[in-house]
């Protein structure tokens, strides 16, 4: 097993432990708690894939971090922080909307890269809006935390979430997954809109209906893919 893969997992486990202690003292805000919950699932998936015990990895990660801090000067730390671009967290959904349980009458699901797409194909002829919580860097979507599709009544009818066992995705991965979800919902006569944040940071262009602009042949391809695969 690659040494860097193991040590990276160990450090991630220890840093998650520190963040959890911080949250336990009621010091974390909503974006912080969102990321903490998602990262916990990701670490469990990575641990299962690597065959590593999380508690043991956390202790090993502590030793690595302590060694780094012992060698790190305050001046070097300042230079490192200054050189790293900062990301922003954008939230279309409240914490309640993100954590709410939902069920599907006609469940359909699909894995697209490292993203998991779910939708209820029993939903027909509804007005639906896609909301997402994600981070942005250089005015582009960096990391999707969670995307959900809501009806006007507030019911959840679709979702895109990162797979814990396959961390890492690009803004193009998210765009492709959203197009699959939109195609599946529109297949049943629903009208789908995308939140302003998603329009701005995931797509550079949009149409008057508030959804990403797709060429006709791509719309047809997406719809056909949904009908046969999802």
Swiss-Prot record:
Region described as RNA-binding and homodimerization: 1-73
Biological process, per Gene Ontology: symbiont-mediated suppression of host cytoplasmic pattern recognition receptor signaling pathway via inhibition of RIG-I activity; symbiont-mediated suppression of host gene expression; symbiont-mediated suppression of host mRNA processing; symbiont-mediated suppression of host PKR/eIFalpha signaling; symbiont-mediated suppression of host type I interferon-mediated signaling pathway
UniProt short sequence motif Nuclear export signal, positions renumbered to this chain: 137-146
Subcellular localization: Host nucleus; Host cytoplasm
Pfam families, sorted: Flu_NS1
Gene Ontology CC annotation, any one: host cell nucleus
Entry PTM: Upon interferon induction, ISGylated via host HERC5; this results in the impairment of NS1 interaction with RNA targets due to its inability to form homodimers and to interact with host EIF2AK2/PKR.
Sorted UniProt keywords: Eukaryotic host gene expression shutoff by virus, Host cytoplasm, Host gene expression shutoff by virus, Host mRNA suppression by virus, Host nucleus, Host-virus interaction, Inhibition of host innate immune response by virus, Inhibition of host interferon signaling pathway by virus, Inhibition of host PKR by virus, Inhibition of host pre-mRNA processing by virus, Inhibition of host RIG-I by virus, Inhibition of host RLR pathway by virus, Interferon antiviral system evasion, RNA-binding, Ubl conjugation, Viral immunoevasion
Region span, CPSF4-binding: 180-215
Principal location class: host cell
Ranges where the record places region PABPN1-binding: 223-230
Keyword Protein transport belongs to the record: no
A Gene Ontology molecular function term of the record: protein serine/threonine kinase inhibitor activity
Cross-referenced Gene3D superfamilies: Influenza virus non-structural protein, effector domain, S15/NS1, RNA-binding
Chain ranges for the short sequence motif Nuclear localization signal as given in the UniProt record: 34-38
Superkingdom of source: Viruses
Function: Inhibits post-transcriptional processing of cellular pre-mRNA, by binding and inhibiting two cellular proteins that are required for the 3'-end processing of cellular pre-mRNAs: the 30 kDa cleavage and polyadenylation specificity factor/CPSF4 and the poly(A)-binding protein 2/PABPN1. In turn, unprocessed 3' end pre-mRNAs accumulate in the host nucleus and are no longer exported to the cytoplasm. Cellular protein synthesis is thereby shut off very early after virus infection.
Comment on protein domains: The dsRNA-binding region is required for suppression of RNA silencing.
Subunit structure: Homodimer. Interacts with host TRIM25 (via coiled coil); this interaction specifically inhibits TRIM25 multimerization and TRIM25-mediated RIGI CARD ubiquitination. Interacts with human EIF2AK2/PKR, CPSF4, IVNS1ABP and PABPN1.
Family recorded in the similarity comment: Belongs to the influenza A viruses NS1 family.
Protein name: Non-structural protein 1
Species of origin: Influenza A virus (strain A/Swine/Wisconsin/1/1961 H1N1)
Taxon lineage: Viruses, Riboviria, Orthornavirae, Negarnaviricota, Polyploviricotina
